[in-house]
Curated annotation (Swiss-Prot):
NCBIfam families: aat. This is Leucyl/phenylalanyl-tRNA--protein transferase. Its main location: cytoplasm. One of its GO terms (molecular function) is leucyl-tRNA--protein transferase activity. Keywords: Acyltransferase, Cytoplasm, Transferase. It comes from Hyphomonas neptunium (strain ATCC 15444).
Amino acid sequence: MSARFGPEDLLACYRRGVFPMADSRDDPRLFLVDPDFRGILPLDAFHIPKRLKRRVCQDPYRVSFDTAFTRVVEACGEPHDNRPNTWINSPIVNLYSALHRQGFAHSVECWDGDQLVGGLYGVSLGGAFFGESMFSRATDASKIALVHLAARLIDRGYVLLDAQFHNPHLTQFGLIEISRDAFKARLKAALKVGADFHGGSDGPAPDQSIGMSSSGGVSDSVTPAGMSSYSGSSLSGMIARSGSFTGSGAVQRITQMS
């Protein structure tokens, strides 16, 4: 891929349904991927296993959005025992950090005190969110980040959550696999949707009582582009089906759906 490949080229790739990867974190080259079959997480059928619902109800981590984007990408690219090598190299970190500064890439972070213990990142275009990678340094941290992401996407009017490939880790959340043509048809429709990751939606009004606590809760960062407080209403619904829950509204609503 050309050394001149920049953020605008990356956005153009996503609009076409392709995405970049590297052979390894030490290889500076990138290549484009256009899978024959695509893994997606249908937002209207997002499933949370019962054990994880109980875990989310316990509010074990403080969850934030876009407060440590580059740290999340770098953590996703760290090798570990089960994954000695990764596809996230320095050009990937730099490209997605540039998209984040432009407002097109976002992260979800899970914190235990001041320690970043899990999270994920991806790209937002129209009503589509393209999940890129996730990491976990504590029990269920990446899963909880994904639940909060799904709740936010539902709350903000998104219609497509792309997981790129079939991943056994994600089948518990309702992952399905569709053909390339079917994915691109869904993508074409999703790009016409005016969803906003940090803006309002046509749904219920935000619960302005949701904020940040030292041990748990949900928070937004504040940037010059402007970010609204996280309502949590979609997640409330998903949780509520599994029993009483006093946490964020979006968490409760999304568990009602499960």
